[in-house]
Every structure is written in C-alpha cells, then in structure tokens.
UniProtKB/Swiss-Prot annotation:
One of its GO terms (biological process) is polysaccharide biosynthetic process. Coiled coil: none annotated. The lineage of its organism: Archaea, Methanobacteriati, Methanobacteriota, Methanomada group, Methanococci. This is UDP-N-acetyl-D-mannosamine dehydrogenase. Homotetramer; probably dimer of dimers. Pfam families: UDPG_MGDP_dh (PF00984), UDPG_MGDP_dh_C (PF03720), UDPG_MGDP_dh_N (PF03721). It comes from Methanocaldococcus jannaschii (strain ATCC 43067 / DSM 2661 / JAL-1 / JCM 10045 / NBRC 100440) (Methanococcus jannaschii). SUPFAM superfamilies: 6-phosphogluconate dehydrogenase C-terminal domain-like, NAD(P)-binding Rossmann-fold domains, UDP-glucose/GDP-mannose dehydrogenase C-terminal domain. Keywords: NAD, Oxidoreductase. NAD(+) binds at residues 20-21, 40, 45, 92, 130, 325.
Length: 427
C-alpha cells in the first residue's frame, strides 16, 4: 500500500503557480503517486515545462520534473480543474501604498478566484505563499460561506540552490483554520517530507515564516551597520566578525551590498504592516535597503570621480543561483546609471535581469572599476590567467569586493588595488 492509498486523501491535487516552489512541489507529489494538475497562467512557462526546456540551476530538478511527467501523474496547463486538494504557490510581492510597504495579495486573490468554480464540499486549500498574519483566516471566511471546505497554511522553508533536498528534509510548520484542516494538510506533506511536521493555528504559522526571515534580516542589518562602523574607525569588519563568532553564543551574519530575494528582503514588511510595535524590524529593513546607495557612494570615493565605466560582476540576489528578484544589484546599477555612469553587467547564472547582460570581456573592457555584488563560485575561483585577461582589458586595475570572496593575493600580484566592503584597514 502506497502512502497515498494509506492516507486516503487528496488522490487529485491541483497546484497553482509553477515557479521556484510550485513546480518542485507538484513534481514531488506526482512522484509519490498523486494525480497532479500543475497550473500556471504563463503559457510560455507551461510550454517550457512540457518540453522540459525551462532553465534552472536547481540540482536534479529537471530529472524530477521529467520523471513526474513521464509517470503520467503530472499534467501541466493554464487553467485549474476539479481536485481534492488545491495548493497555492504564487508570488506575494511587496508594494508601496501611501508611503508604506505592504503585501500585494493580487496574485493570491486571483489564484483563489480561479479555483472557486471547481471547489466542492470537503476540499482542502493549502496556501504556501508567504502572507501577513490573518490572511488564511480571511480566505477561509470568504470561501466557507457557500461550501464546507478546509484551509491551511504551510509556508515553504527552502533555500534556492538546494530546493529539492530541503523540500524533503526540512521540518515543516502547518497551520490550519481548525484542527481538521491542519491534520488533512499534514497527511499530504508526510508523503514526501522526512523532517518533522509541526501543527498549529494558521495565524501562528504565518507569523513563524515571517519571524524566520525577519530574524536573519535584522542580523544582517547589524552586520551591515558593523561594516559601516568598521570603515569609519579603521578596522576590518570581516576579521572582527570572525573573532566575535568564536564566542559560543554569538553568530553574526555577513555584511554585503544589501539584502535581496523574494523572502528576506520582503517578509519583514508584512509584520511592519500589521504592527506599530515593529520598530526594530522597520529600522533593520531600512538599513539593509540603504546598502546599495552606500556601495555607489563607495565606488565614487574609490575612483575619485562622479562618472566613468563600472563593470558589475554578479546580479543575482545570492551566489550560484539564477534568481534576480529584489537583487541589490538592480538598485546599484539603477543608481549608477541615473548618475551618469556607464554600467556593464556580467553574470552567467542570471536570468530575467532588468538590465542587459554582457560577456566578461565586454563588461571589463575599459572599466574604471570592477564591483563584485554576488558570491558566485566563478569569481572565487578566478585563476592567474583569468585575472591577467581581465587586467589586459580594464582601464584601471581597481576592484571592489562587497562579498569578501576574492583571492586578494592573486589580484594584487596582477597589479589590482582590491577594496573590500567593511575593511577600514585598507580603505
């Protein structure tokens, strides 16, 4: 007897949204034996999934999707169908409204509207999208007027680059609008999750996800403030953090050019939106949002002029992923262009970046400065010949490493002056 047969629930699952979370989730469920309908309103995305031509840096994702489709258990299309369970994995971006940043529930509301014609008594709706506290309860109140349904929130907790591994191994928190909803959702996830599954109410589950990312955002803000102080007083923040973290109860994260991605840079605002007491959270978010401008000012200070050519290495929000959402690089590039700089970006990982991407040679040709904004392994592993090639093309042998990843000695041997964000000893 399979887990699906044993649980006796949700033989048919409709997953709305086939992005970074929805596609792996739909594929994982299909492999477990569920009849899965994967839905995305983007026809191009649906076509690429069907043809297995979509781009991804996730290890083994293409193999998983291929297996799910070939099994006959995963069908991909642009419209929902009747199902026992509906899992919603759509974006919930942050928008500015009356001077305040708030969660934009447009995609979530459209997803809910799209499944309403197919809802039947006894159906379960699971929301994986990150949402402000109280959203799941609000959705339940609206939908339960006409039918007896169950609603739960099960926020994703995965790290891009390791999604499949963490989808299976990470613990999960599931919050239901009632105990039955939480239990029903648990029966779905325990078919593939090997980590522990903790049950609670919906509002607590919503807050747990926001707290996880807010904790990291506040910690990074502290590191970024330390970096600014280090430059001011003449110490190397990276050395200081490493030594401070020798204390068994201290774990300061790393500073950088800002915080990006669709979680850490967004989620804290959902708490601020709901509470006037979130003063520290707001301050941390504002500090991290200020870092791209800090980097731009540092560039101008280093090259000692207010115009020139800047080569940007790395436009994704973190290293070795293709995701450019909320990337600090976008803000850095935008500000530089606004101030009259010529900017060329190089990133072989990135997709869907708002500005054109160039080859390495194109980016560095005639550059006044190279700026590292993402910790891709490629940049860490530049060898002597790579650096010689770059040195032969730049106008000035100057590099600003905002992630502290370069082999400084190699670059200096080729005549480069290497600056590191937060290193006040070598400013």
């Amino acid at each position: 007897m399979t887990k699906v047969e044993k649980n006796g629930i949700g033989k048919r699952i409709c997953v709305i949204g086939l992005g970074y979370i929805g596609l792996p989730t739909a594929s994982m469920l299909a492999i477990q034996g569920f009849d899965v309908i994967g839905v995305d309103i983007n026809e191009k995305r649906v076509k690429e999934i069907k043809e297995l031509s979509f781009k991804t840096t996730e290890k083994d994702l293409m193999t998983l999707v291929k297996g799910a489709i070939n099994s006959g258990n995963l069908k991909v299309q642009t419209k929902p169908e009747k199902a026992d369970v509906f899992i919603i994995c759509v974006p919930t971006p942050c928008i500015e409204c009356d001077g305040e940043k708030k969660c934009d529930l447009t995609y979530l509301n459209k997803a809910i509207e799209s499944i309403k014609p197919y809802l039947e008594n006894g159906n379960l709706i699971i929301i994986e999208s990150t949402i402000p506290p109280g959203t799941t309860d609000d959705i339940y109140k609206k939908l339960s007027k006409d039918k007896k349904i169950y609603v739960a929130h099960c926020p994703e907790r995965v790290l891009p680059g390791s999604i499949l591994k963490e989808l299976v191994e990470n613990d999960r928190v599931i919050g239901g609008v009632d105990e039955k909803s939480a239990e029903m959702a648990k029966e779905i996830y325990e078919t593939f999750v090997t980590g522990k599954i903790y049950l609670t109410d919906a509002k607590t589950a919503e807050m747990v996800k926001l707290m996880e990312n807010t904790y990291r955002d506040v910690n990074i803000a502290l590191a970024n403030e330390f970096a600014k102080i280090a430059e001011e007083i003449g110490i190397n923040v990276w050395e200081a953090i490493e030594l401070a973290n020798k204390h068994p109860r201290v774990n300061i994260l790393k500073p950088g050019p800002g915080v990006g991605g669709h979680c850490i840079s967004i989620d804290p605002w959902f708490i601020v939106e709901k509470s006037k007491n979130a003063k520290l959270i707001r301050t941390a978010r504002e500090l991290n949002d200020s870092m791209p401008l800090f980097v731009v000012e540092k560039i101008k200070k280093i090259i000692k002029k207010d115009i020139g050519k800047v080569a940007i290495f790395g436009v994704t929000y973190k290293g070795n992923v293709d995701d450019t959402r909320e990337s600090p690089a976008e803000k850095v590039v935008s500000k530089l262009i606004d101030e009259g700089f010529e900017v060329k970006c190089y990133d072989k990982y990135a997709r869907d970046f708002i500005y054109p991407l160039n080859s390495l040679d194109e980016a560095v040709e005639g550059a006044d400065i190279i700026v590292i904004l993402a910790e891709h392994d490629e940049y860490k592993n530049f060898d002597k010949e790579d650096i010689k090639n770059i040195a032969s093309k730049v106008k000035n042998k100057i590099i600003l490493d905002t992630k502290n990843i370069l082999n400084r000695e190699l670059w200096e041997k080729e005549g480069f002056k290497v600056y590191v964000l937060g290193d006040g000893k070598n400013a």
